[in-house]
């Protein structure tokens, strides 16, 4: 459930620097080190336009993908979560950015990008249910089950999962994406949401047991980031080795954002500093892991504007109002 913490408005992404490598560092010397200083990209790359344009396109395509049909109630519940204001759109943006890294066509990536957001929304609907995490609020607004009831929320989530697969098959341009690639995309998403992915993480989160915290973080939060990056790589024509680098990158980013959210929440609750220090160290380690994988592409292809959006996922986490030890 990648980036499933508090809502972040589009303006927050717009506040990212247009030239990442010239980002002025306003944090204290003990602050988390940003990858911006080493991020590739030309002086002319307009990051703000990239993010706003891409998110606007994704929102439009998601709106078109889920029209209200009969019975209207279930479609309204589906749209409530998928089109929610404040949604970060991290999975679809990461997918498109990874596709474009390898020269892929954005038009080829949009159907899968939208499918990833549908799956992400479905997982959050189910996550918030009283029988799961019992969260009455999502992104500052009532959760799906709070508005529509638990029964309808379950149905809305159940409907979004197959709709995601259907959308990939019916909307992916056959002249841009081979059938074999479509099959791999579906397999990747199915693995992510199933008993070896997010479902496993949610199970352990519910039941506990002899599992390390990293297992829950990897399965429940890292899996969606991993899937988003890999799907983009598949659409862009990445090699198997490159897909593995994307897999490690996405997993690290997904886990990083959750750790950051946990740190922020702990600061609000004034927990003891010992646990917080451990989480800060974990966040720094995850950040470095994500950067390491991107540097593989930087070294291989000589950097360039196409890497900047993927670096910003790491940089944005690094500047979310918390400090890490050097």
Swiss-Prot record:
GO function terms (MF aspect): metal ion binding; prenyltransferase activity
A matching Pfam family: polyprenyl_synt
Subcellular compartments: Plastid, Chloroplast thylakoid membrane
Transit peptide feature range: 1-33
Keywords: Chloroplast, Coiled coil, Magnesium, Membrane, Metal-binding, Plastid, Thylakoid, Transit peptide
Coiled coil, from the record: 274-301
Disulfide linkage: none
PROSITE patterns hit by this protein: POLYPRENYL_SYNTHASE_1
GO CC annotation: chloroplast; chloroplast thylakoid membrane; thylakoid membrane
The keyword Secreted appears for this protein: no
Positions with a binding annotation for isopentenyl diphosphate: 88, 120, 139
InterPro entries from the UniProt entry: Isoprenoid_synthase_dom_sf, Polyprenyl_synt, Polyprenyl_synt_CS
Membrane disposition: Peripheral membrane protein
Tissues in which the UniProt entry reports expression: Expressed ubiquitously.
Binding note for cofactor: Binds 2 Mg(2+) ions per subunit.
Residues annotated for Mg(2+) 2 binding in this entry: 127, 133
Record: residues binding dimethylallyl diphosphate: 138, 220, 258
Cofactor: Mg(2+)
Keyword Membrane: yes
Primary role: Heterodimeric geranyl(geranyl)-diphosphate (GPP) synthase small subunit. The small subunit alone is inactive in vitro while the large subunit GGPPS1 catalyzes mainly the production of geranygeranyl-diphosphate in vitro. Upon association of the two subunits, the product profile changes and the production of gerany-diphosphate is strongly increased.
Sequence similarity: Belongs to the FPP/GGPP synthase family.
Subunit note: Part of a heterodimeric geranyl(geranyl)diphosphate synthase. Interacts with GGPPS1 or GGPPS2, but not with GGPPS9. Interacts with LIL3.1 and LIL3.2.
Protein name listed in UniProt: Heterodimeric geranylgeranyl pyrophosphate synthase small subunit, chloroplastic
Organism annotation: Arabidopsis thaliana
């Amino acid at each position: 459930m990648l980036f499933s913490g508090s809502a972040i408005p589009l303006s927050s992404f717009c506040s990212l620097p247009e030239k990442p490598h010239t980002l002025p560092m306003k944090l204290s010397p003990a602050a988390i080190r940003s990858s911006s200083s080493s991020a590739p990209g030309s002086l002319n790359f307009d990051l703000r336009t990239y993010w706003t344009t891409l998110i606007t396109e994704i929102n439009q395509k998601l709106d078109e993908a889920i029209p209200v049909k009969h019975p209207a109630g279930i479609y309204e519940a589906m749209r409530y979560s998928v089109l929610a204001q404040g949604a970060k759109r991290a999975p679809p943006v990461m997918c498109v950015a990874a596709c474009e890294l390898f020269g892929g066509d954005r038009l080829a990536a949009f159907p899968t990008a939208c499918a990833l957001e549908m799956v992400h929304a479905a997982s959050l609907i189910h996550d918030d249910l009283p029988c799961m995490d019992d969260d009455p609020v999502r992104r500052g607004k009532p959760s799906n089950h709070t508005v529509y009831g638990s029964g309808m929320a379950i149905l809305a989530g159940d409907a979004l999962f197959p709709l995601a697969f259907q959308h990939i098959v019916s909307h992916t341009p056959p002249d841009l994406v081979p059938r074999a690639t479509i099959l791999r995309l579906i397999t990747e998403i199915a693995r992510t949401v199933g008993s070896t992915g997010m479902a496993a993480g949610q199970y352990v989160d519910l039941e506990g047991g002899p599992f390390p915290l990293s297992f829950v973080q990897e399965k429940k939060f890292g899996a969606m980031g991993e899937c988003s990056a890999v799907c983009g790589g598949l659409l862009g024509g990445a090699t198997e080795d490159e897909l593995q680098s994307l897999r490690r990158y996405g997993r690290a980013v997904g886990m990083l954002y959750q750790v950051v959210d946990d740190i922020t929440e702990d600061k609000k609750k004034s927990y003891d500093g010992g646990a917080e220090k451990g989480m800060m160290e974990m966040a720094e380690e995850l950040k470095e892991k994500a950067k390491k994988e991107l540097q593989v592409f930087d070294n291989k292809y000589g950097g360039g504007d196409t890497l900047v959006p993927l670096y910003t996922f790491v940089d944005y986490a690094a500047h979310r109002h918390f400090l890490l030890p050097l």
